[in-house]
């Protein structure tokens, strides 16, 4: 590893999802305590790879996001350092103590919620991008050294929550920002169903998306797949996703759609033809709407008896867009 590397780690801290993940009925149950111990081992490996490596840890909690650790704050000596221990390496001791304590504090703050709001993954992703931008363009008089400013940046998302269709546009905006900053986004789906938006984030930024088949091998996945920085991945065999789900969320109902109708003016996506675009207020001819409605494929009913010719599985569009409103 020639140059330094920066890692921004985003941890999904949804209490309900981690409760489900730890159930003994799962093929490979994974508790949050075991998960966190493996994550700390992984970040220690990142720190040990090179002295100039930097680290930031963000927590995506229900309804909010928070920074749990920053190597810049640790180097500045903010008074929160753990007591010295002759039997442990100080940087490891600091990151383990700070991440564990701050995570517990954040979870205690949301413990009294009667209803769990969606996890603020987009907020954590935005904070990670802002932190990386601050590293790349440090203000005058800041504590960011030259090695940290020139570090190879990447973001690793450890996700357990399902997709939130309403966050489609903010996620895409974050992806475009990551592309502009040349930031690689890696995703490890630890528990739950596949996430459409995070698949696209990893694919569009040149990162890796891995769905854990064996959660009892979580640490091995982290070390073998996500420890090497992007600058070294062209010379090693890093697992890649075989297929990418490019479906989008409609702007009208925030649902993920297989077939979308796209406004030819502002590129807004709708699940059905509309007379007036709700985004740019463009009006479409009635003949165009009739033609698009007539061309919509027949959807088989729930009892399996179709009134028309159902599409074969291979015919499902991979882009999420099939028609344009003109």
Protein language model regions, located:
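P/S/T/G-enriched low-complexity
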Residues: 144-151, 174-181, 188-326
């Amino acid at each position: 590893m020639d140059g330094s590397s920066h890692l921004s780690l985003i941890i999904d801290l949804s209490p309900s999802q981690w409760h489900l993940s730890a159930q003994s009925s799962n093929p490979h149950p994974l508790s949050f305590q075991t998960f966190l111990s493996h994550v700390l081992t992984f970040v220690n490996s990142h720190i040990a790879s090179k002295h100039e490596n930097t680290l930031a840890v963000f927590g995506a909690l229900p309804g909010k996001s928070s920074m749990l650790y920053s190597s810049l704050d640790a180097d500045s000596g903010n008074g929160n350092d753990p007591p010295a221990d002759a039997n442990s390496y100080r940087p490891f001791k600091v990151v383990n103590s700070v991440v564990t304590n701050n995570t517990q504090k954040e979870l205690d703050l949301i413990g009294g919620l009667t209803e769990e709001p969606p996890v603020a993954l987009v907020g954590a992703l935005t904070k990670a991008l802002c932190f990386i931008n601050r590293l790349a363009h440090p203000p005058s008089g800041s504590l960011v050294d030259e090695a940290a400013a020139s570090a190879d940046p990447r973001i690793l998302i450890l996700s357990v929550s399902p997709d939130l269709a309403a966050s489609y546009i903010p996620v895409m905006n974050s992806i475009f920002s990551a592309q502009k900053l040349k930031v690689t986004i890696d995703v490890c789906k630890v528990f739950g169903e596949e996430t459409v938006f995070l698949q696209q984030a990893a694919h569009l930024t040149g990162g890796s998306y891995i769905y854990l088949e064996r959660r009892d091998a979580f640490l091995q996945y982290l070390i073998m797949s996500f420890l090497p920085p992007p600058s070294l991945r062209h010379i090693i065999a890093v697992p890649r996703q075989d297929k990418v789900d490019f479906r989008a969320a409609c702007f009208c109902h925030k649902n993920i759609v297989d077939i979308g109708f796209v406004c030819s003016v502002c590129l807004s996506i709708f699940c059905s033809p509309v007379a007036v675009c709700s985004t740019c207020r463009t009006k479409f001819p009635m003949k165009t709407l009739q033609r698009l409605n007539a061309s919509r494929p027949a959807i088989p009913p729930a009892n399996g008896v179709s009134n028309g010719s159902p599409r074969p599985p291979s015919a499902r569009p991979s882009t999420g867009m099939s028609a344009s409103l003109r």
